[in-house]
Curated annotation (Swiss-Prot):
Pfam family name, one: PNMA_N
Gene it is expressed from: PNMA8A
Residue segments, region Disordered: 213-439
Species of origin: Pongo abelii (Sumatran orangutan)
Annotated Basic and acidic residues bias: 423-439
Bias kind Basic residues: ranges: 231-249
InterPro entries linked to this entry: PNM8A_C, PNMA, PNMA_N
Residue spans of biased composition, Polar residues class: 403-419
Protein family per UniProt: Belongs to the PNMA family.
The protein's name: Paraneoplastic antigen-like protein 8A
Length: 439
């Protein structure tokens, strides 16, 4: 067995049996078949002269196939005087003990520890007296030698070290327990924080309230598997519909044309002064041509339709000149009555025929101006034919009358062409010309 292995075995054995290592010996090399009596007989011849001793225990060492004995010596025995080897049964028996130089190193470390703690050897002795009151009886007795005194001192120091070690361990255990409690508190606080985060807040309550208010809408969206449309898209759709309504409003407002009432009241005035009518029609047509929007074209059609209707509303409110001339000739009144009973499509058909035959302009212009104007022009021409020269005021008036139908010709032509096939079989223009010749 090696020396290091023997020393480790000595330390462990002393610690296990709670024996002071400074008074313990380890004897190795004892044969396995050697008994207790033979072991004591061999040790008695070597250790008896040095002082008292006793065999504490024996152990079998498997590696060496030998026995080892733990021996405790008395307090006055000097370990340095014990031989390290002596003869025995089966060979040489070896002795292992702690080296005194190791004790010196231990004392040095102990002095440093006492200086760091602010203690002295007197304090150590006082503590030993408190722990072991029996030692106070032998306090005044001088020790037999310095080795015994040193052993007592070392025993006291070892006890102090054990007490301090126990105190340090208790403090470490208390600190470890506090750290464990702190970790438990931190884990509990973390778990509580997670629970607080998982609890529903105001947003969940508002969402549940909205869902409770409109459950059908939510169910419908869930059944269709489509998310609800965003509010921005709905606002855009509403704005588009409003824009469409704004575009449609001018078209609807342009249909009820209010100005034709004034045109109806002054229809004969327009017939008498056709140049003014041509100027107004040109003034109306120029902004219509300048505008490019489709809604303005519809306004132009709306302007033309009431003009066509106004030509038929004229006979209901005849001017003063027409009433004065209607009283004198009888044929004129008959023609007025005939004109009053005629329907608007016939007059439009006459306008269409007049647009087709531009050669006899005088006959066509009389027919296209309505019943009242036709009678007035024909009666005046009958009175003034034999007397009036070519370059008189009548010729100017006829020229102005010729200009008026030309200004109104496109509007009436469009209306007559749309209803032209209905007016062809009637043949009203020829009758009118025959009647004028008879008169």
């Amino acid at each position: 067995m090696s020396k290091t292995m023997a020393m480790n075995l000595l330390e462990d054995w002393c610690r296990g049996m709670e024996v002071d290592i400074h008074r313990s010996l380890l004897v190795t090399g004892i044969p396995e078949d050697c008994g207790q009596a033979e072991i004591e007989e061999t040790l008695n011849g070597v250790l008896a002269p040095l002082g008292p001793y006793r065999v504490l225990n024996k152990i079998f060492v498997r590696e060496e196939n030998v026995k080892a004995a733990l021996i405790e010596v008395g307090e006055g025995v000097n370990l340095s005087t014990i031989p390290r080897e002596f003869p025995g049964r089966g060979g040489v028996w070896r002795v292992v003990c702690r080296d005194p130089t190791q004790d010196a190193e231990f004392l040095k470390n102990l002095n440093e520890f006492l200086d760091a703690e602010g203690r002295t050897w007197e304090d150590v002795v006082r503590l030993l007296q408190l722990n072991h009151p029996t030692l106070s009886q032998n306090q005044h007795q001088p020790p037999e030698n310095w080795a015994e005194a040193l052993g007592v001192l070392l025993g006291a120091v070892v006890q102090i070290i054990f007490c301090m070690d126990a105190e340090i361990r208790s403090r470490e255990e208390a600190r470890a327990q506090e750290a464990a409690e702190f970790e438990e508190m931190a884990a509990w606080a973390l778990a509580a924080g997670k629970k607080v985060k998982k609890e529903p807040g105001l947003a969940a309550e508002v969402g549940s309230a909205l869902k409770a208010e409109t459950p059908n809408n939510w169910n419908a969206t869930e059944d269709q598997h489509d998310p609800p449309k965003p509010l921005v898209r709905r606002a855009g759709a509403k704005s588009r519909s409003r824009r469409k309504k704004q575009k449609k409003n001018p078209k609807q407002e342009a249909v009820p044309w209010k100005k034709p009432k004034g045109i109806n009241s002054s229809s004969t005035a327009n017939l008498e002064d056709p140049e003014v009518g041509d100027a107004e029609s040109m003034a109306i047509s120029e902004p219509i041509k300048g505008s490019r929007k489709p809604c303005v074209k519809q306004e132009e059609l709306a302007l033309k339709k009431p003009m066509a209707k106004c030509a038929w509303k004229g006979p209901r409110e005849p001017p003063q000149d027409a009433q004065a001339e209607a009283e004198s000739p009888g044929g004129a009144s008959e023609s007025d009555q005939d004109g009053g009973h005629e329907s608007p499509p016939k007059k439009k058909a006459m306008a269409w025929v007049s647009a087709k035959n531009p050669a006899p302009m005088r006959k066509k212009k009389k027919v296209s101006l309505g019943p009242v104007s036709y009678v007035l022009v024909d009666s005046e021409d009958g009175r003034k034919k034999p007397v009036m020269p070519k370059k008189g005021p009548g010729s100017r008036r006829e020229a102005s009358v010729q200009k008026a139908p030309q200004g109104q010709q496109p509007a009436e032509a469009t209306a007559s062409t749309s209803r032209g096939p209905r007016a062809k079989p009637e043949g009203s223009p020829r009758r009118a010309t025959n009647e004028s010749r008879k008169v």
